[in-house]
């Protein structure tokens, strides 16, 4: 190997040390399932999307089994606007008419999911896109929103009632990376758009995942947002449940997903900053990690 200067030699040495530091984490996670909720800037910034896809391929080639769950709220909003379809929200949820659902299905599986599958597959034949409709992966239950203290109908919006992981296990056994779009039928076969945070937690719990990672647009969990000194490195489920009512509205579904996962047997859940390139590898394979780690009380 040619060495052209001290800076390059130092850089090479640092890279070797980083790889060596990853060894115990690679051993711990080898053969384990890691569920990753893919959202936020990581979905819209081209550099971050490519880095995320590379992270998934890296994990797969290290013998770790990533499972990706994604939503696509901003992309759905953009397509509805482009098509001139009214977009209404109640209680923080998109009112999903049959017309809006058709757009959501097109965007989630046909656009967001396909783009990520293609980015991962640039590294090898790894990723397979599926939805909650495939092989009855998810069964949805209709949900409502609370507006002014009253339950309000929001259309074809659901929560996860049941999970059938057979198809995902088949993909994992074949060393593929499932990329899951969050659409699911109810017991009568009526398709609903389901919250991706909820879906990721339910899938992690049912798969017996080692970790659940939630990508966000903040550095982690703040107890007093936006005071930077209130960023939490680690918190248990009991303390987090007490903190839940005080959190910003956008963080609540992610925290609820973390709580569901760790109380359901997942050893740890992590809220990490998806704006950071290779944030998944930083969290999983370095001593310092990133974001906030949630564990059971």
Curated annotation (Swiss-Prot):
UniProt entry tagged with the keyword Transcription: no
Keywords from the UniProt entry: Amino-acid biosynthesis, Arginine biosynthesis, ATP-binding, Cytoplasm, Kinase, Nucleotide-binding, Transferase
EC category: transferase
Gene3D superfamilies xrefs: Acetylglutamate kinase-like (3.40.1160.10)
Domain of life: Bacteria
Family: Belongs to the acetylglutamate kinase family. ArgB subfamily.
Protein's recorded name: Acetylglutamate kinase
